Design a protein with these regions (language model features):
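Class I S-adenosyl-L-methionine
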Residues: 1-103, 114
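A contiguous loop/helix-start segment that scaffolds small-molecule binding in enzyme catalytic cores
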Residues: 3-5, 73-74, 151-244
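Fold-independent oxyanion-binding glycine-rich loops
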Residues: 8-12, 33-35, 52-54, 79-81, ...
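Short gly/ser/thr-rich secondary-structure transition/capping motifs
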Residues: 9-15, 137-139, 201-203
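Class I SAM-dependent methyltransferase SAM-binding "motif I" and its flanking Rossmann-like core
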Residues: 12, 84-152
Length: 244
């Protein structure tokens, strides 16, 4: 049988793809982080739903692999896209011991693109996505990536800017960026994408340093071509300049 690693998209499921919905309908078992299982529980009352808490990712993926290897179609659900800070890579790594198991990754809408749509069009040119979580990546590595992305004039999208224990990571990241970029650089944040309390704000890099982010926040730092147009964050692709 098959293990499907499924992206639920943003929020409570309104942004889920038709492919993802079809897979969840077809699978006998749905596995995921407790909060994500709760998002789909009402829609799939007749499925077997299995969940594990935060920081039990290895256990969760092994559970899904074992159930699929036993002959069932299993869906491992992730928020956003399973290949962007999701469970796709871990499932594929752990499945090395099950070479006969078929694994399919079902893409979803990630916070970078869903958040960008709420702000306007900040990702229309080259961009870098960086997580500020240092749980699995040393902070020194994160700082180096931030600095290099700023020097290269990428638009930067930040995932995981804060948590209950990581309250100052966004400020520290802004300090790194401010060593390369002006405080007036256009930025934006989106909170609770697709959920109650959804919010999109546009301000400067200097103002971003003082912003109180949480684990449901996605941050955008513009490049030299990023402007605020009618309260929307817009990065030029260059078409108008080509016509001049």
């Amino acid at each position: 049988m098959t293990l499907y690693v499924v992206g639920l998209g943003p929020g409570a499921g309104a942004g889920m793809t038709a492919q993802a919905r079809a897979v969840l309908e077809a699978c006998q078992v749905i596995v995921g982080y407790t909060a994500y299982i709760n998002l789909v529980r009402a829609d799939y009352p007749n499925k077997e739903l299995l969940s594990t808490p935060m920081r039990s990712e290895v256990e969760r993926c092994r559970m899904a692999i074992e159930r699929a290897a036993s002959g069932e179609d299993v869906a491992m659900v992730c928020s956003g896209d399973p290949g962007v800070y999701g469970m796709a890579s871990l499932c594929l790594e752990l499945a090395e011991d099950h070479p006969a198991l078929d694994i399919e990754v079902i893409p979803g809408v990630t916070a970078a693109t869903s958040g960008a749509a709420l702000l306007g069009a900040p990702l229309t040119h080259d961009f870098a996505v960086i997580s500020l979580s240092d749980l699995l990546t040393p902070w020194e590595t994160i700082e180096r990536r931030l600095s290099c992305a700023a020097k290269a004039d990428f638009v930067i999208c930040l995932y995981n800017p804060a948590s209950r224990k990581r309250t100052d990571h966004l400020r520290r990241a802004c300090d790194v960026l401010l060593s390369e970029l002006p405080a007036t650089r256009c930025c934006g944040v989106v909170r609770n994408i697709g959920r109650e309390g959804e919010q999109a704000l546009v301000f400067t890099l200097g103002e971003l340093r003082e912003y109180q982010a949480d684990m449901f926040t996605t941050v955008f730092i513009g490049n030299q071509q990023t402007r605020v147009i009618c309260e929307r964050l817009v990065t030029s692709r260059g078409y108008l300049q080509r016509e001049d």
